[in-house]
């Protein structure tokens, strides 16, 4: 199907995946199967990023389930959690929790802090913002370009959740919808953002110390737990260096063309194209799985080029 004539198709059903918790059978000395070994429980340690005791979370298969588990441990509402970082309580956008969770990772949940309202004059076509979301309805600022319109407004910070644009509540919108809304704002006019910043951390020594020792408690496996919006989570091997570079390139293209960063979306796009032989097959595969995004053709060709480079060893 030519790229220009792509139609939306019903998303292909994902193939059945392994259970989150699996047991292994050990063989007896006489060749008779022994009793099943105790099921392995995947337990992760978590803290509130602004300071708290350490809690334990387990038995979840999606981001929303994980947030509910964390909220239950710390007796807060799941809607209070803006996003999570891995192995650091800092607002480090390179350490965001997405659809993959290392089996040794320590989770820090960043919760709602101060609300603020900011008026911005759109002097340029581009605001200099990169948007991402937490997978459960909260879009937030992942990057601010140096010297941009937003960079000049010092009250707007990386990590701020965008709650409203010009009075319109956007909770529940995906990152690409928020980016599109911001891009469509008229140049040389004022607009208003209602933001919620993450609760600020108290500088408590023991908290960072706990983060350093957490991996000893969790285990030594180097796999990752892949969280999915539908179906069970699965334990997978870490991606190869070549695959990781290709996914990062796709993520860079998402930022360039759409003003978003989403490593899980980039991974899904890579997986859709890795066994395709030409860009038209790739376009059909993306329409089946990600048709709602309506990616531009030029973007699709660039993504196909990034995937092809990896397949050809470049």
From Swiss-Prot:
This is PDZ domain-containing protein GIPC2. Its main location: cytoplasm. Residues 117-197 form the PDZ domain. It is found in: Cytoplasm. Keywords: Cytoplasm. Gene3D superfamilies: 2.30.42.10. Probably interacts with SEMA5A. Residues 13-25 have a biased composition (Basic and acidic residues). It comes from Rattus norvegicus (Rat). Disulfide bonds: none annotated. Belongs to the GIPC family. Residues 1-36 are annotated as: Disordered. It comes from the Eukaryota. GO terms for molecular function: identical protein binding. One of its GO terms (cellular component) is cytoplasm. Residues 1-12 have a biased composition (Basic residues).
């Amino acid at each position: 199907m030519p790229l220009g004539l792509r139609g939306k198709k019903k998303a292909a059903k994902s193939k059945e995946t392994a259970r989150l918790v699996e047991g292994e059978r050990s063989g007896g000395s006489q060749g008779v199967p022994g009793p099943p070994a105790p099921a392995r429980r995947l337990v992760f340690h978590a803290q509130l990023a602004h300071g708290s005791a350490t809690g334990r979370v387990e038995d979840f298969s999606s981001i929303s389930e994980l947030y509910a588990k964390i909220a239950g441990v710390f007796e807060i509402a799941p809607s209070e959690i803006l996003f999570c970082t891995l192995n650091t309580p800092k607002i480090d956008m390179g350490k965001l929790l997405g659809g993959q969770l290392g089996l040794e990772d320590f989770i820090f949940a960043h919760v709602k802090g101060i609300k603020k309202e900011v008026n911005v004059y759109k002097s340029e076509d581009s605001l200099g913002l990169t948007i991402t979301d937490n997978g459960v309805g909260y879009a937030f600022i992942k990057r601010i370009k140096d010297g941009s319109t937003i960079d000049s407004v010092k009250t707007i910070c990386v990590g701020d959740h965008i709650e409203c644009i010009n009075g319109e509540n956007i909770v529940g919108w995906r990152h690409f919808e928020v980016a599109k809304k911001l891009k469509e704002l008229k140049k040389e006019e004022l607009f208003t953002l209602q933001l919620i910043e993450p609760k600020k951390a108290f500088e408590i020594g023991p908290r960072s110390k706990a983060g350093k020792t957490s991996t000893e408690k969790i285990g030594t496996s180097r796999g990752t737990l892949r969280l999915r919006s539908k179906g069970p989570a699965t334990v997978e091997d870490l991606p190869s260096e070549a695959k990781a570079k290709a996914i990062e390139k796709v993520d860079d293209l998402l930022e360039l063309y759409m003003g978003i960063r989403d490593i899980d979306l980039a991974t899904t796009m890579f997986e859709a194209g890795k066994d395709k032989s030409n860009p038209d097959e790739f376009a059909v595969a993306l329409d089946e799985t990600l048709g709602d995004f309506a990616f531009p053709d030029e973007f699709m060709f660039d993504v196909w080029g990034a995937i092809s480079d990896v397949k050809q060893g470049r």
